[in-house]
C-alpha cells in the first residue's frame, strides 16, 4: 500500500478552498448574458471555445492533490446540477463558492462546523419554500420559447425550435440534439411510434419516388419468433385479403420461403403486405413488442403467452391509421390502442424508470415512454465550423433541459433576482444558537453572489447594483445585464426555471456543507522514481 500524506483542520480547509476558488473563478466568468468565453485546449484538433459552466468544470484537474480535492467536490456540484436540471451549473458553482468561503472564515473564527451546517440547511429550506411560492406556471408557447432562448445564451432560433418541438411531441416526447451536416439549424418531428427497423425487402416499396412503404389503415401482426414458412398463416392471410386492408408483419425475422411468398403476393397485387424485423433484443424486444401491441390494440403472438400462429384470428391483429417504412425506420401513426391502456403502460414504465440504477436502461425506458405518450423530435444544429457547431450544440442541450424544467416547476425572474428577493424570507428566521445563526447569515450573503457576478461580467459594479435592487420591493424588478436597464424581468423575457434555481441552491449548500465540516484530508504521496540499475559489465 502506498504511503499517504494527511492534512488536518485549517491547513486542510485552506488547501481545499484554494482548489474551490481556482475552479469557481474559471467557471463563473461564463455567467449571464454578457458572460465571457473560456478556451479549452484539446490534445488533438482545434481548442474548444465554450460558455457552458459544466464543460469548463469537467476540464479542470489541479496538480496539487489537496487543492484538486476541493476542485473535484465543486465539480460535483456542477455535474449534479447538470444531471438534475440541465442548466444553472454556473449559478450553483458561484453559490457553493460563496458559502464555502464564508463558512471557512466562520470555522477559522472558532465556530462549530456542525451548527453552521444546521443553520445553512435551515436557511436553504426556507428559501426553497419562498421560491416555490413565487414560481409561475408556464404553458404558453411564447413563454417556453423565452426560457429556451435565455438558456441558449440569447439564441432566438434555438428558442423557437425548442418551443415548436415541445409543442409537437409534448412534455413526454423525446427531443434529441444532433450535429447537422449543413450550415442551417433544422427541426424534424416524428409523430407516433418509430423504431429503427426498415423493410426486409425493397420489393415491398409502394412509393417508388421516395423509396418508402406506405400502408393506409393496415392490420398489424406482431410475432415474437422467426417466420420461415407461412403454412400456419394461410387462413389469416385469406381473411386479410377479403377485408381489402394491407398487412404489416413485425417478427424477429422473416426469411426464406415466407419472405419469398409475401414478395410474390405483393407483386401480383393479391395482398398489400410489408414485413419488418422486431425492434430491440432479448427482454427489451419482448417489452417493445408489447408496447406496439398496446398502441395498436393488438396481441403479441408468442408461445410463452399461449398463442400459436395457426390460432391467430383477424381480431387479434393490431390496427393503425397509417404505417410508413423506409430502409432504416418504421413509423406507426395513430394506433388504435385504448387511451386508458396506453396510460397504464406509461405509468408502469415510469415506475421502472424510478427504480433503475443504470443510466442506459433509464434512457431506453424514457424513449419507450416518449414513443407511447408523445413523439420524437430531432434538432439538427448547423454552423460554419466544427468548433461553432459543438458550441451551439452545448447551448441547445442546456436550453432543452432548462425548458423541460420550466414546464415542470414553473418560472421565476432571472438574473439572480429570485434569490435576492428570497432574502426577506430569512428576516424572521430564528436559530437555536449563535453558530446556527451564523449559518443563516452565510446563506444570506451567498444569495447575493449570482446577481453580483452577472453584473460584474457585464462590466458593471456588482455590489452597487445588488444594493440598488434590494432598495425596491417589486418581485420581478431587476437588472437586465443584456441591455443595462432596470426593468420588469419577466415582461422582458429574462426568466429562469424554478427547478434550476432551487436545485442550484440545494446542491451548492449540500457540497459546501461537506467542505466546511471537513477536518482531515488524505492523499497518496507521489512515488519516487528509482533509477534503473546499471547492467552488469562483462570484462
Curated annotation (Swiss-Prot):
Key word Chaperone present: yes
GO molecular function: ATP binding; ATP-dependent protein folding chaperone; isomerase activity; unfolded protein binding
Catalytic activity: ATP + H2O + a folded polypeptide = ADP + phosphate + an unfolded polypeptide
Keywords: ATP-binding, Chaperone, Cytoplasm, Isomerase, Nucleotide-binding
Compartments (UniProt record): Cytoplasm
CDD domains recorded: GroEL (cd03344)
Annotated binding of ATP, by residue: 30-33, 51, 87-91, 415, 480-482, 496
A GO CC term assigned to this protein in UniProt: cytoplasm
GO biological process terms, semicolon-separated: protein refolding
Enzyme Commission number(s) of this protein: 5.6.1.7
Oligomeric form and interacting partners: Forms a cylinder of 14 subunits composed of two heptameric rings stacked back-to-back. Interacts with the co-chaperonin GroES.
Protein family membership: Belongs to the chaperonin (HSP60) family.
Function: Together with its co-chaperonin GroES, plays an essential role in assisting protein folding. The GroEL-GroES system forms a nano-cage that allows encapsulation of the non-native substrate proteins and provides a physical environment optimized to promote and accelerate protein folding.
The name this protein goes by in its record: Chaperonin GroEL 1
Organism: Erythrobacter litoralis (strain HTCC2594)
Amino acid at each position: 500500500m502506498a504511503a499517504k500524506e494527511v492534512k488536518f483542520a485549517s491547513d486542510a480547509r485552506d488547501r481545499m478552498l484554494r482548489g474551490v476558488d481556482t475552479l469557481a473563478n474559471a467557471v463563473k466568468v461564463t455567467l449571464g448574458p454578457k458572460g465571457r468565453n473560456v478556451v479549452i485546449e484539446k490534445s488533438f484538433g482545434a481548442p474548444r471555445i465554450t460558455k457552458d459552466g459544466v464543460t469548463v468544470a469537467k476540464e479542470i484537474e489541479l496538480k496539487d492533490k489537496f487543492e484538486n480535492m476541493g476542485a473535484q467536490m465543486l465539480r460535483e456540484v456542477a455535474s449534479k446540477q447538470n444531471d438534475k436540471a440541465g442548466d444553472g451549473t454556473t449559478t450553483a458553482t458561484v453559490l457553493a463558492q460563496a458559502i464555502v468561503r464564508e463558512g471557512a472564515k466562520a470555522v477559522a473564527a472558532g465556530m462549530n462546523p456542525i451548527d453552521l451546517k444546521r443553520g445553512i440547511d435551515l436557511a436553504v429550506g426556507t428559501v426553497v419554500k419562498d421560491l416555490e411560492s413565487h414560481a409561475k406556471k408556464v404553458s404558453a408557447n411564447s413563454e417556453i420559447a423565452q426560457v429556451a432562448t435565455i438558456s441558449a445564451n440569447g439564441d432566438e432560433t434555438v428558442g423557437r425550435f425548442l418551443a415548436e418541438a415541445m409543442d409537437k411531441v409534448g412534455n413526454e416526447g423525446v427531443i434529441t440534439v444532433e450535429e447537422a451536416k449543413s450550415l442551417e439549424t433544422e427541426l424534424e418531428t416524428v409523430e407516433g411510434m418509430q423504431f429503427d427497423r426498415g423493410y426486409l425487402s425493397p420489393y415491398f416499396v409502394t412509393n417508388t419516388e421516395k423509396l418508402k412503404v406506405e400502408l393506409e389503415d393496415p392490420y398489424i401482426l406482431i410475432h415474437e419468433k422467426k417466420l420461415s414458412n407461412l403454412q400456419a398463416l394461410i387462413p389469416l392471410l385469406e381473411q386479410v385479403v377479403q377485408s381489402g386492408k394491407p398487412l404489416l408483419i413485425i417478427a424477429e425475422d422473416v426469411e426464406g420461403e415466407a419472405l419469398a411468398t409475401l414478395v410474390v403476393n405483393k407483386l401480383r397485387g393479391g395482398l398489400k403486405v410489408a414485413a419488418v424485423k422486431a425492434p430491440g433484443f432479448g427482454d427489451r424486444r419482448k417489452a417493445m413488442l408489447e408496447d406496439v401491441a398496446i398502441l395498436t390494440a393488438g396481441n403479441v403472438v408468442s408461445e410463452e403467452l399461449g398463442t400459436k400462429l395457426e390460432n391467430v384470428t383477424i381480431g387479434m391483429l393490431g390496427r393503425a391509421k397509417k404505417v410508413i417504412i423506409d430502409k432504416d425506420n418504421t413509423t406507426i401513426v395513430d394506433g388504435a390502442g385504448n387511451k386508458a391502456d396506453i396510460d397504464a403502460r406509461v405509468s408502469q414504465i415510469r415506475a421502472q424508470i424510478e427504480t433503475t440504477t443504470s443510466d442506459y436502461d433509464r434512457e431506453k425506458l424514457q424513449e419507450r415512454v416518449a414513443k407511447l405518450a408523445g413523439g420524437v423530435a430531432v434538432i439538427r444544429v448547423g454552423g460554419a465550423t466544427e468548433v461553432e457547431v459543438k458550441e451551439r450544440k452545448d447551448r441547445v442541450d442546456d436550453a432543452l433541459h432548462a425548458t423541460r424544467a420550466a414546464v415542470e416547476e414553473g418560472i421565476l425572474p432571472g438574473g439572480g433576482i429570485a434569490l435576492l428577493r428570497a432574502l426577506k424570507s430569512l428576516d424572521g428566521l430564528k436559530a437555536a444558537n449563535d453558530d446556527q445563526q451564523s449559518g443563516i447569515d452565510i446563506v444570506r450573503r451567498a444569495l447575493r453572489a449570482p446577481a453580483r457576478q452577472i453584473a460584474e461580467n457585464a462590466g458593471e459594479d456588482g455590489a452597487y447594483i445588488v444594493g440598488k435592487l434590494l432598495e425596491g420591493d417589486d418581485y420581478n424588478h431587476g437588472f437586465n445585464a443584456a441591455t443595462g436597464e432596470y426593468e420588469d424581468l419577466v415582461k422582458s423575457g429574462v426568466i429562469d426555471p424554478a427547478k434550476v434555481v432551487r436545485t442550484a441552491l440545494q446542491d451548492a449548500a449540500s457540497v459546501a456543507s461537506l467542505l466546511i465540516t471537513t477536518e482531515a484530508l488524505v492523499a497518496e504521496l507521489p512515488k519516487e522514481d528509482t533509477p534503473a540499475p546499471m547492467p552488469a559489465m562483462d570484462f
